[in-house]
């Protein structure tokens, strides 16, 4: 018996060891892939998860695949995420019904007077349809939310809309209410926001009006969202390490089925991906098919060209720009000269002056003076910096300032158009002012300065596109202009998580904070889209997008080449009040997008799987991508000929008044030599919802390779001005 027991024990130990070894091999050789299978089958006996498990068993040869299956997408579209080897991935990609198999990549976050700036005033000063606004649900896919924030209080709210099919699954000590009606977590951390990003974006889109808010006295005023009476559903897909593709797809799968009216998502890749490998493009397509508009951020990789993310035409892509309010932080030198820098500095040093030390003068033995001037890590001698204001030629000094004992920091800002928050007194100077500061330091035996608390300034020139905002052209669908629109995304005050850091290595905790990024611009447009939808609940996503784009303000963008063109701002700056009365709209449906994808050379077989419909990509059913009925017109030229001729075909739908006559007018862009003919030049609409088609032929020669040629087409009936940008370009020269 003893020998039997010993043998059994030994066998069990060997079995555990073997299984552990196999598990280790699987973990080492596999990675998470997403298997996208298009629309859900209409067969009554089809069970998605069973199909997914069957595929895995077939490919892996394993009867138990619980350790392989990560997620199953089964509510709004079909697919799954699983741990696969490269050979297994290849096998699955060949299976009938599979559209694409792509790695689970990690995406990144695209991180109050703004609504007043756009003309949406507080209280009774703004026209609202409160009954429908209260039935509008905005899905926020982000880092979660802080449910206790006043911005999400349900005081005065009735029960959730009857159409709501979601849940409150926020985790421990997380409670939803009649304002924050839903919460889902895909990170195993719970839906509570620990970074502040998701709380910030949610309150910008749909937060309640909260008076007397500020960041330690900076930017004092009322914080509110665009549609404060609407409901919010929070979907947490991001952690400190990023946002996984498989979680993003799962959040779309749920949000669509839960019954949201609109999705705002301030997340993306640094560069665009092909549609079938892009989780946001996939999710947004199925949202569009269900009548749900997806609004997303353009990215923060500007002003370099071709950096815009979210380039699919069924995604509303938002750039970031300034408002008329800004923050400046003055630096007063020992000689009395004042330099106006940029930061959000809440530290009050009472105007006291401290010694200045330039990084290169505090170089340690590990670095040369040039590297130390940038305040690179491990380059500074602590004894020379302690108790002084550190002066750096770049932003890296913020990471080491505290460790070397600096009392404050002044740097040459790489983004002098933006005020950033820091964990110690700071000011970022323009290159010219920084040069002046260095000259002062080098001319004095005991240079000193004071870094003052931030001041708020108004009535500055605006809107201006932020330098960080990602630029086009679109590298996936080259004839679709992206970004689509711009909105406030610089120095935005909104709700924040008390568990989050207002800046890196910051020990302070706040309920409202200031951030900049296309992440902040995106929820502004989401709020506007929801606002328009409250007046036109039957409008499709494309009609809402068109109304916003064709009524946008003209804007300015600084920089050389494409950085200052429509590739920076699309149709212009969002104008919420004008969007309520566009007159005419460019309308698209699912079939139009399928025809567009046919024109992008997707096969009939693939598109049938994606759409769930019978698709034939014949000459009759496919369209050139530039002829998609989009509110903007863009074409990339071959560049082989000095002369060119391009035609765009469009159709407008009358949503204004019956018996309307619209006349066309073309306004050429600065320096443009384009010849543009509109046929017919006049459109007559007898009834509301009537459609009329027209074509725009653009001819010219010798288009500049660095700057696109552009114009604006305006259809006007004397009351409405329906404006669409027209852009033609050859290639893009990287100006970096």
Swiss-Prot record:
Residues 32-110 form the Inhibitor I9 domain. GO terms for cellular component: cytoplasm; extracellular region; nucleus. It is an enzyme of class 3 (hydrolase). Residues 1-24 form the signal peptide. Specifically expressed in root stele of the root hair zone. Residues 25-110 form a propeptide. Residues 353-437 form the PA domain. GO terms for biological process: proteolysis; response to jasmonic acid. Glycans are attached at residues 173, 220, 381, 459, 601, 649, 659. It holds the Pfam family fn3_6. The C-terminal propeptide is autocleaved. Belongs to the peptidase S8 family. This is Subtilisin-like protease SBT4.12. The gene is SBT4.12.
